[in-house]
Amino acid sequence: MRKHSVDLNSDMGEGFGPWKIGDGVDEEIMPLISSANIATGFHAGDPNIIARTVQLAKNAGVGVGAHPGFRDLVGFGRRDIGETPQALVNDIVYQLGALREFARFHGVSVQHVKPHGALYMRAARDEALSRLLVETLQQLDPALRLYCMEASVTYRIARELGQPVVREFYADRDYGRNGSIVFTRRAGRLDPRQVADKVLRACVDGRVATVDGEDIDIDFDSICLHSDTPGALALARATRDALTAHGIRIAAPATAEANGIRIDEA
């Protein structure tokens, strides 16, 4: 199942005022990726940061995507905030609307949506939330690509309702037997070479090792590298270098499709 083309995405613009999450290396990471998930103000991001990040993406030729989260600035969107369905719909519309206007102002379009943190993980296992999310996107723009894991309720609902979907592989996260990511405590930074080898194996062989030491099949359209992972820049460089050295093209889904490469056949 060797891949000839793959997307490389990262969360960008995750700060607020003078505050930054991670190493603050958005400018260095942006040219290495093909899709940027831009924080839209509720877990991180403010008007100045959003504008700057959209411009960075435009300058680098990187696809712009919205990265909406729960209304949880203090907890960085990692807390499951109890909201009514209508309030959550309004929050998502608000965040996407903000990014789309900044994108329009800078002469680019929003190509995808990737929920952040607790919203992403809760939707992955919650059918009602996934359906609400997908139906909201369909009303806003049925062509928006939704990023999610294949081993998730979100993926199933998106396919059922006909929303374009981009399946993710997490380079800097561990996997469980069911193909979903698990969160484990690590001492120190990830080794860039090991991360690059993990990505290459997934791209070439379609396999990934789980935290239990077993191998499972994995398929995906996009590789996610978190910009707030310690040493994120080194991980991004090693991953990109490994992919290009093995002849695997890095391209956003819209670019791949424009060149006749279907995402599910890349």
Curated annotation (Swiss-Prot):
Domain of life: Bacteria
A single MF term (Gene Ontology): 5-oxoprolinase (ATP-hydrolyzing) activity
Gene3D superfamilies: Glycoside hydrolase/deacetylase
GO terms (BP aspect): carbohydrate metabolic process
Enzyme class: hydrolase
EC number: 3.5.2.9
InterPro entries to which the protein is assigned, alphabetical: Glyco_hydro/deAcase_b/a-brl, LamB/YcsF/PxpA-like
Keyword annotations from UniProtKB, A to Z: ATP-binding, Hydrolase, Nucleotide-binding
Catalytic reaction equation(s): 5-oxo-L-proline + ATP + 2 H2O = L-glutamate + ADP + phosphate + H(+)
Entries under Pfam families matching the protein: LamB_YcsF
Family the UniProt entry places it in: Belongs to the LamB/PxpA family.
Function (record text): Catalyzes the cleavage of 5-oxoproline to form L-glutamate coupled to the hydrolysis of ATP to ADP and inorganic phosphate.
Quaternary data: Forms a complex composed of PxpA, PxpB and PxpC.
Descriptive protein name: 5-oxoprolinase subunit A 2
Organism: Burkholderia pseudomallei (strain K96243)
Gene name in the database record: pxpA2
